[in-house]
UniProtKB/Swiss-Prot annotation:
Catalyzes the initial step of the lipid cycle reactions in the biosynthesis of the cell wall peptidoglycan: transfers peptidoglycan precursor phospho-MurNAc-pentapeptide from UDP-MurNAc-pentapeptide onto the lipid carrier undecaprenyl phosphate, yielding undecaprenyl-pyrophosphoryl-MurNAc-pentapeptide, known as lipid I. The gene is mraY. Its cofactor is Mg(2+). It comes from Shewanella denitrificans (strain OS217 / ATCC BAA-1090 / DSM 15013). The chain crosses the membrane at residues 18-38, 73-93, 97-117, 134-154, 168-188, 199-219, 236-256, 263-283, 288-308, 338-358. This is Phospho-N-acetylmuramoyl-pentapeptide-transferase. The lineage of its organism: Bacteria, Pseudomonadati, Pseudomonadota, Gammaproteobacteria, Alteromonadales. It catalyses: UDP-N-acetyl-alpha-D-muramoyl-L-alanyl-gamma-D-glutamyl-meso-2,6-diaminopimeloyl-D-alanyl-D-alanine + di-trans,octa-cis-undecaprenyl phosphate = di-trans,octa-cis-undecaprenyl diphospho-N-acetyl-alpha-D-muramoyl-L-alanyl-D-glutamyl-meso-2,6-diaminopimeloyl-D-alanyl-D-alanine + UMP.
Length: 360
């Protein structure tokens, strides 16, 4: 909203023209979301404690998790609020991409909120029935996929960028809708599965969002896009503000979520953030790159698939417990060691993903 005010004030003082620069607004967006999260965090935690909205811990999980029982959850509300405030202040609300991101964050956040509410407030350990959760996720993702396909005006908006191959960018046609759907829903559930240890999910999310901020900026700049042989997407520049808002809100949340956590994000945070990363990947045409940079999320998801598949087919488990971060806990690794090592892996994969922009 302040973009429009600054545009109006430019006629009185040219200094306000600085607000037209995406990079300047991106920095302000990051700082706004960060300060908002740090300021509102203690208030939200106290409120959640008063309402007795505490984490439900599985009885068959690692014994070290029993001490987490009752820790305030649904802290993802803090992240989403920080992102929304930041984007509404510094983003261009006429941008199709910004509106899509607000819809994704809001819709998947609502699904996660319903799930958390049933688990924590109504004491239903199953939460939202898996079938209904998947149906609601699918509807939201399909709305986004169909809208983006039907409103696309440039060939690059429906091409697939293949890392390491600069001349391989097939036009997807209707396959775009299928790929966008699976990317958004898959990323949403992958981050949700990763959110099992203090700070484990939020830091990789911050890293990937930061990398996508750079990619969105490059995609929105015609000279950089042509140099790197990626689609030039004029609207992608505004995604930088969304990405930096996620980074700022995520870092602010990590202040309270780092080991030992004072609050957990809950499904309201993990489902929304995962879907947001998936949607950003779709918008900048980097779905495959998300698989690389979000490798920790992929690893967690694959471990669950392998565990369930092996048990059903052979009656044997591959890991001591899935997702895989619990496997290492049961092997005797202290929780902070698991978390930091997964962070290091995530940083490596994000840097590898960024390197593919040039290694083509």
């Amino acid at each position: 909203m302040l973009v429009y005010l600054a545009e109006y004030l430019t006629q009185f003082h040219t200094g306000f023209h600085v607000f037209s620069y995406v990079t300047f607004r991106a920095i302000l967006g990051l700082l706004t979301a960060l300060v908002f999260s740090l300021w509102c965090g203690p208030k939200l935690i106290r409120r959640l404690q008063l309402l007795q909205i505490g984490q439900v811990v599985r009885n068959d999980g690692p014994e070290s998790h029993f001490s987490k029982r009752g820790t305030p959850t649904m802290g993802g509300l803090l992240i989403l609020a920080g992102i929304f405030v930041s984007v509404l202040l510094w983003g261009d609300l006429e941008s199709r991409y910004v509106l899509v991101m607000l819809f994704v964050l809001g819709s998947f956040g609502t699904i996660g909120f319903i799930d958390d509410y049933r688990k924590v407030v109504r004491k239903d350990t199953k939460g939202l029935i898996a079938r209904w959760k998947y149906i609601l996720q699918s509807l939201a993702a399909l709305v986004v996929a169909v809208f983006l396909y039907s409103s696309s005006t440039l060939p690059g908006e429906t091409q697939l960028v293949v890392p390491f191959f600069k001349d391989v960018m097939p036009q997807l046609g209707l396959v775009f809708i299928v790929l966008a759907y699976f990317t958004i829903v898959g990323a949403s559930n992958a981050v949700n599965l990763t959110d099992g240890l203090d700070g484990l999910a939020i830091m990789p999310t911050v890293m990937v969002a930061g990398a996508f901020a750079l990619i969105a900026y490059l995609s929105g700049h015609v000279q950089f896009a042509n140099y790197l042989h990626i689609p030039h997407l004029p609207e992608a520049g505004e995604l930088v503000i969304v990405c930096t808002a996620i980074v700022g809100a995520g870092l602010g949340f990590l202040w309270f979520n780092t080991y030992p956590a004072q609050v957990f994000m809950g499904d309201v945070g993990s489902l929304a953030l995962g879907a947001a990363l998936g949607a950003i990947a779709v918008l900048v045409r980097q779905e495959i790159l998300l698989v690389i940079m979000g490798g920790v999320f992929v690893m967690e998801t694959v471990s669950v698939i392998l565990q369930v598949g092996s048990y059903k087919l052979r009656g044997q488990r591959i890991f001591r417990m899935a997702p895989i971060h619990h496997h290492y806990e049961l092997k005797g690794w202290p929780e902070p060691r698991v978390i930091v090592r997964f962070w290091i892996i995530s940083l490596f994969l994000v840097l590898l993903g960024l390197a593919t922009l040039k290694l083509r």
